[in-house]
Amino acid sequence: MGIKMKRSVCPYDCPDACGLLVEVVNGKAVRVKGDSEHPFTRGTLCPKMNRYQETVHSPLRLTRPLMRTGAKGSGLFRPISWEEAIKQIAERWRGMIARYGSEAILPYSYAGTMGLIQRNAGHPFFYRLGASRLDRTICSPAKQAGWKAVMGETPAPHPDEAAESDLIILWGINAIATNIHFLHGVKQAKKKGARIWLIDTYQTLTSSVVDQTFLVQPGSDGALALGLMHLLVQWNLIDHDFITTHVQGFEELKEKILPDFRPEQVSQLTGLPSGVIESMAKTYGKAKRPLIRVGAGLSRYGNGAMTIRTIVSLPALVGAHGKRGSGCFSSINTSGAFVMKEIFREDFMTKATRLINMNQLGLALNELKDPSIQSLYVYCSNPAVVAPDQNQVLKGLSREDLFTVVHERFMTDTARYADIVLPATSSLEHSDLYCSYGHTCVQRAQPVISPVGESKSNWEVFSLLARAMGFEEPFFKQTADDLIDHLLSIPTPMREGLDEKTFAAGKAVELLFPPDARIRFQTPSGKIEILNPREPHPLPCYLPPYEGEYPFRLMAAPSFYALNSTFREREDLRKKEKAMFLKMNPADAGAKGLKGGQDVVAFNELGEVPFILQVTPDVPRRVVVAEGIWWLEHAPGNRSVNALTSQRLTDRGAGSTFYDNTVDVKSG
């Protein structure tokens, strides 16, 4: 029996980007475990990846191209050959381009894989085709906009520096579910006596590893940050020398903004008692190395960018930015280690085509004109359940005149609406290059098993489509490994000093940031820009979240057992999650005459979704929580939480507002 242990990388949209060891027996992955030699993840995996082989070799894997034979959404298909599938797609597209123009075609993708090649494989093809462009802003562009408004391109601290902190604030992040390896440094700091706080909208699993949890009203986090700054200034718990040398706009903030954020006012906005706010400010102001870990969820409100901007400004007042073990950790841009324009190939565009925001797919499919969307090509995403305003998305996908192609591993809800379904490889079956937004490691991954069935990678499919569409550019004739080799042949400052020998062996290797990178503030002024004259609001301020007419704020939160809609094919994980729950405070449930375990319906102006009610004191009054995105076949009413979320965008960054919606709840 041929047993081999091979290295790979977790491909999913998670900051941890774990190193994997895959046990392969006779060409089949039989076990997946963590790579103990990975510098950051150190051999541990989340429950989703611990049995990744069950996803890779699932009996539900798509193994052949399929053509629709029934109504859209019915899931009725017949097998066809790859040759026939590619031929049909190319013929349909050529006809559409002749009749409507190339902008009638829209690609839709996001981070189904984070590999630099396979994730971005469609960009050069669709640029060359002249298709409509997709504004890929569904996750956290508002967080990036908020950070950049203050810090520019200044890098965040290394996540392992958390071990050197004496106060760690997990602000708007359920780290156990979404960033579990960051907790390694948190636990080390706690052993040394550091205090650990969680600021969130409800008691999450992460509450179990912190010293204290502070629950705030959804969308009010910016007010809390301003209130803390008000008290730091009032009590002179600020670093005057650091402010004078490194901060632009402190005096303006002090005079024009902070006087309006006394504890009593902040208490009304956040729901925290004034005394608690004062205690938080004293502890933060007296800490020697306070570190804030900012979660992406904070940015998924109408005021998301401003909220992040305000929180990121807070450490500047106490001189925490630039000191080891302190400051603010948002994300790390390690993709800058590679010249990605060599993969994107924007130079293939003959003109800039229209840009369509992916959060407004429902609007695009149903209302866009001149031309209307006539074809949708979906890869690395499942918009039927992950895009907001689900009813509008499904309405658009149901259009008989919409030619939809879906490249997928499973018969997802989106695939059920496709005209052509193409089987996709898993990360263990293709080559790619990985970096992380949660640590500084980069790693090259080779296939560890052959493709399952007739599945093909993103790059292989786009190469076939390029040939079918008559593209002559040599670029499309390369392999994924050719593209990786090309990226590695171009030196960049971020890769200086990289351990090339270890990297070539397929192991994760850390990028080496200059020691002074965090105090060379990469902004136009060279300072932390609390005052940013280029922003619509030059100073950080409090912008309220969107108001709704319904009594409960809906938190569409992440699940411990899934990653958005990924892993929903796994019955073992679904059994652990048990059901599609809606969490509600006991007092609210009592006022409505509702009991735990009963069928309920959450509803608003966009739609209604059945849930099983879970009554728990972990959720504050006037808030309800729905964790995870379920496939519709597992949802009690054939709808999931995004039937209740709006297509509205954030204040900056044009991001999603998944956390900024209101609902009411009734008995089911």
State where each predicted segment sits:
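Glycine/threonine-rich phosphate-binding loop and adjacent beta-strand/alpha-helix elements that clamp
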Residues: 159, 428-451, 466
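Extended redox/cofactor-interaction regions of prokaryotic respiratory oxidoreductases
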Residues: 117-187, 192-199, 222-226, 312-417, ...
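A glycine-rich phosphate-binding loop feature that marks nucleotide/adenosyl-phosphate handling sites
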Residues: 245-248, 327-338, 478-491, 606
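Long, contiguous, secondary-structure-rich segments that constitute the structural scaffold
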Residues: 452, 458-502, 506, 570-583, ...
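Active-site phosphate/pyrophosphate-binding segments
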Residues: 228, 246-361, 507
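Phosphate/diphosphate-binding loops
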Residues: 9, 15, 393, 398-403, ...
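N-terminal export/assembly segments and adjacent metallocofactor-ligating motifs
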Residues: 1-235, 246, 253, 273-274, ...
